[in-house]
């Protein structure tokens, strides 16, 4: 029989993946210290930062349709990463049973796992999370560069959120080529940029909840 905790995690990840419009403000109960506690702290910090940034954006951009019910939801990681699938608990990572199918250990260099040694499936999960963070970090940086050109100087991205993303990426420590995005000068429509900011913040908060729950699961495993 599959462990109940793994099934609960799976149902949560699937729900987050398919129902992005839900409000998920509640955090998980505190877990005991474990090998993944370092990244759990970073993920909790990230969730707080993106929640605060989203709240400020909704207040500042109240006339820009910035609520979850008003925006058109968009996932910039779609067809590029597969975090929900990659982060399935090992007990559920087989086709016909709940037995662990892969026990191969890999050496990782990040601080998310204190031992530096983790399973193949866990490494895939952390790698996918890293790629998610990298895509959002690049997108937010490019968007902030546009907002800095806005004569109204109405809103900018909270540097605490960008720093929280960077900290978790550094803790994961996967080497991946990064191509900085530059703001497009062809279409400098600041209204569209602010609407897009709302869309991205809502999507990223959902992803931050998913990441936080995965880190909680890993830290208590």
From Swiss-Prot:
Disulfide bonds: 39-112, 66-198, 87-125
Swiss-Prot/TrEMBL GO biological process terms: immune response
Entry keyword set: Cytokine, Disulfide bond, Glycoprotein, Growth factor, Secreted, Signal
A Pfam family per the record: IL12
Metal-binding is among the record's keywords: no
InterPro entries registered for this protein in UniProt: 4_helix_cytokine-like_core, IL-12, IL-12_alpha
GO MF term (any one): interleukin-12 receptor binding
Keyword Signal: yes
Glycosylation sites: 41, 95
Membrane-spanning parts: none
Signal peptide region: 1-25
Subcellular localization: Secreted
Any GO CC annotation of this UniProt entry: extracellular space
Description of how the protein assembles with itself and partners: Heterodimer with IL12B; disulfide-linked. This heterodimer is known as interleukin IL-12. Heterodimer with EBI3/IL27B; not disulfide-linked. This heterodimer is known as interleukin IL-35. Interacts with NBR1; this interaction promotes IL-12 secretion.
Functional note: Heterodimerizes with IL12B to form the IL-12 cytokine or with EBI3/IL27B to form the IL-35 cytokine. IL-12 is primarily produced by professional antigen-presenting cells (APCs) such as B-cells and dendritic cells (DCs) as well as macrophages and granulocytes and regulates T-cell and natural killer-cell responses, induces the production of interferon-gamma (IFN-gamma), favors the differentiation of T-helper 1 (Th1) cells and is an important link between innate resistance and adaptive immunity.
Protein family (similarity comment): Belongs to the IL-6 superfamily.
Name assigned to this protein: Interleukin-12 subunit alpha
Species this chain originates from: Cervus elaphus
